[in-house]
């Protein structure tokens, strides 16, 4: 989102106190809508986690909508968002528009059960975590062990949220696995495929 800063439109609101201008994302945040658009990294993670916690503070029971169009990114950054989604008391609906890959698909399936949505032309990609390391052989071995544990934990959580066996998830994550919106629904990544907001209401 930061790369589009110069393209973000402003919304003008009139009130008894005068005229106020908001960027479109701040305006949508007032409606409890959060966007993840692009790569997931520490900056995006900090922003999304802060928005989730702020909205929970405003109203701990009202739904938050998280819209995702992301190729994935840093695993630890994604886990920070995942844990915060589970931590807050608000239900969190997730909506895939465009593409949810890797950590993007992981966050998509982490929404509140019954509130995980894909738009009809969305594409979802699952695969195992990626990593590359340099250094001493002993350090490379430790990194390899760590990424193996991360892969195992991700498979456990996919199985938990999607209603699949651990073994099936592990096989699916072994290679790039693309899904249509309907295939993602069948697999348990999302609960619904909606083409209009009226159907989601």
UniProtKB/Swiss-Prot annotation:
Keywords: Cytoplasm, Hydrolase, Protease, Serine protease. It is an enzyme of class 3 (hydrolase). Gene3D superfamilies: 2-enoyl-CoA Hydratase, Chain A, domain 1. Its main location: cytoplasm. NCBIfam families: PRK00277.1, PRK12553.1. One of its GO terms (molecular function) is ATPase binding. It holds the Pfam family CLP_protease. One of its GO terms (biological process) is protein quality control for misfolded or incompletely synthesized proteins. Fourteen ClpP subunits assemble into 2 heptameric rings which stack back to back to give a disk-like structure with a central cavity, resembling the structure of eukaryotic proteasomes. This is ATP-dependent Clp protease proteolytic subunit 1. The active site is at residues 102, 127. It is found in: Cytoplasm. It catalyses: Hydrolysis of proteins to small peptides in the presence of ATP and magnesium. alpha-casein is the usual test substrate. In the absence of ATP, only oligopeptides shorter than five residues are hydrolyzed (such as succinyl-Leu-Tyr-|-NHMec, and Leu-Tyr-Leu-|-Tyr-Trp, in which cleavage of the -Tyr-|-Leu- and -Tyr-|-Trp bonds also occurs). The keyword Cytoplasm applies. Cleaves peptides in various proteins in a process that requires ATP hydrolysis. Has a chymotrypsin-like activity. Plays a major role in the degradation of misfolded proteins. PROSITE patterns: CLP_PROTEASE_HIS, CLP_PROTEASE_SER. Belongs to the peptidase S14 family. InterPro entries: ClpP, ClpP/crotonase-like_dom_sf, ClpP/TepA, ClpP_His_AS, ClpP_Ser_AS.
């Amino acid at each position: 989102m930061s790369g589009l800063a110069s393209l973000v439109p402003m919304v003008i609101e009139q009130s008894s106190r005068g005229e106020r201008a908001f960027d479109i994302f701040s305006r949508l945040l007032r409606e409890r809508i959060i966007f993840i658009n692009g790569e997931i990294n520490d900056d995006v993670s900090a922003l999304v986690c802060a928005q989730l916690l702020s909205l929970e503070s405003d109203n701990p029971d009202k739904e938050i909508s998280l819209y995702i169009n992301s190729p994935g990114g840093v695993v630890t950054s994604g886990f920070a968002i995942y844990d915060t989604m589970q931590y807050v008391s608000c239900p969190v609906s997730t909506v895939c528009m465009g593409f949810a890959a890797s950590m993007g698909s992981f966050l998509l399936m982490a929404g509140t059960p019954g509130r995980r949505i894909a738009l009809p032309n969305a594409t979802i990609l699952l695969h195992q975590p990626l990593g590359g390391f340099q250094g001493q052989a002993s350090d490379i071995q430790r990194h390899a062990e760590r990424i193996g544990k991360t892969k195992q934990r991700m498979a456990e959580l996919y199985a938990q949220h999607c209603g699949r066996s651990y073994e099936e998830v592990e096989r699916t994550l072994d290679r790039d696995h693309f899904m249509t919106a309907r295939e993602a629904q069948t697999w348990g990544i999302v609960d619904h495929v909606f083409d209009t907001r009226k159907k989601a209401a």
